[in-house]
Every structure is written in structure tokens, then in C-alpha cells.
Curated annotation (Swiss-Prot):
Homodimer. The keyword Signal applies. It comes from the Bacteria. This is Thiol:disulfide interchange protein DsbC. The gene is dsbC. Residues 1-18 form the signal peptide.
Length: 229
């Protein structure tokens, strides 16, 4: 009986892999790239993590939809895509520019652009965020994409010997004199697209929830405490 059960599991796994491969081929035919097929919390629906963002596909590959998918919990709606991507987000921790809170209560990751007014405003208030127990981690998200000077300047900042100093200087208007091909920045940008980032700053909680744009320190703390309940 145990051997039969194991064999059935193997057949089911093989069928699932075959279905995933078929879905992948179908998406590739529409020029969707770097596809990873995952399960979803909805029966009959698969999650496709792609360079173009998170997509949801029926198991037969006939239907596709894009947009936010929320799990309705007792504490309110939770973005499913963020939960899927949070491990990938944290795998970039060594590439983040981090401003740690001494008495850390919350950690947020901010997709930022050095030309963004509200990013400047957020950066100017870092001490206030830190004093409230909020650690801020930055990832690069040049709003104009990869083929521009800002992306190259941000690459120089993120790969500097002292990235914190380099970013602080850039925020004062002292931009890098030498620029670099945006390799790390490209990874950050693509992750931002997967999260659904459309502008900066975009704030992501430790659970992968995308809060949105700039929030004053006290307002951000309130939002984080509400999502943590």
C-alpha cells in the first residue's frame, strides 16, 4: 500500500510539472520572460512570477489575469504577491543601503530614486523614523528605467566602498563623478516591477506588503502597527 501511495504521489507531481511547463510555454509565446510557476492560494489557479510582474493563470493555461490579489484576513486584506516575493526581497539584504534603528521595532524596505522629491523628504527624516524604531533599507528604483544617467549614478552609489556615505552625499546634491553600468540596480528595478512599484518612494513591510508612497514618520509607524496586528 505504501508503494502504491508513493507511486501516486510521483504521478501527481509529474502531472503538476507537466502542467507548469505548458503554462510556461504559453506565457513565453506572449514574450513574457524569466517565468517561475508557483502555486496560489486559489484552487485551480497558478502564480507566475515574471520579469513583467506577478501574473495569475488558470491551470489549463487558458485564462490569465494581472493585478492585486488579496487574502481577506481578520486584520484586513493582505497582498498575496508580497508574501510570495518577501524571501526574494530579503535575499537582496547585502545589496541594500541600511539605516538601522537602535531600538528596532519594524523594518521597511524602500524602493527609491535619487531624483525623487518625496524620496529626498523621506531621507531627510531618517533620524525620526529610526527614533521611532523603524529600520529603513533602500533598494534602487530609477523611475525612468535602465537607459538613463540616474540608473548609472545609482549603481555607482550602491557599489561604492561606503554606500551610506555615497547616498548621503547624493542626497546633498553631490552626485558620483564616475557612473557604472546598472547591474545591481537592474535587479532591484526588476524586483520592484514584480512588487507592482509604479513610483517612488514605495515602502514594503517585513511581511511583503506594499504600503505605497511617502508617509510621515508617525504615520508610517501607525501603518506598520496596524499591519502587524
Amino acid at each position: 500500500m505504501k508503494k502504491i501511495f508513493t507511486a501516486l504521489l510521483c504521478v501527481a507531481a509529474a502531472n503538476a510539472m507537466a502542467d507548469d511547463a505548458a503554462i510556461k510555454r504559453k506565457l513565453q509565446s506572449f514574450n513574457i520572460s524569466n517565468i517561475v510557476i508557483k502555486s496560489s492560494p486559489i484552487s485551480g489557479i497558478k502564480t507566475a512570477v515574471t520579469d513583467q510582474g506577478i501574473l495569475y493563470v488558470s491551470e489549463d493555461g487558458k485564462y490569465l489575469f494581472e493585478g492585486k490579489l488579496y487574502e481577506l484576513t481578520n486584520n484586513g486584506p493582505v497582498d498575496v504577491a508580497g508574501k510570495i516575493l518577501v524571501d526574494k526581497l530579503n535575499s537582496y539584504k547585502d545589496e541594500m543601503i541600511v539605516y538601522p534603528a537602535k531600538n528596532e521595532k519594524h523594518v521597511v524596505t524602500v524602493f527609491m530614486d535619487i531624483t525623487c522629491h518625496y524620496c529626498h523628504l523621506l531621507h531627510q527624516q531618517l533620524k525620526e523614523y529610526n527614533d521611532l524604531g523603524i529600520t529603513v533599507r533602500y533598494l534602487a528604483f530609477p523611475r525612468a528605467g535602465m537607459n538613463n544617467q540616474t540608473a548609472k549614478q545609482m549603481e555607482a552609489i550602491w557599489t561604492a566602498k561606503d554606500p551610506v556615505f555615497a547616498l548621503n552625499e547624493a542626497e546633498k546634491g553631490n552626485l558620483p563623478k564616475e557612473v557604472k553600468t546598472p547591474n545591481i540596480v537592474k535587479k532591484h528595478y526588476e524586483l520592484g516591477i514584480q512588487f507592482g512599484v509604479r513610483g517612488t518612494p514605495s515602502i514594503v513591510t517585513s511581511t511583503g506588503e506594499l504600503i505605497g508612497g511617502y508617509l510621515k514618520p508617525a504615520d508610517l509607524l501607525r501603518a506598520l502597527e496596524e499591519t502587524a496586528q
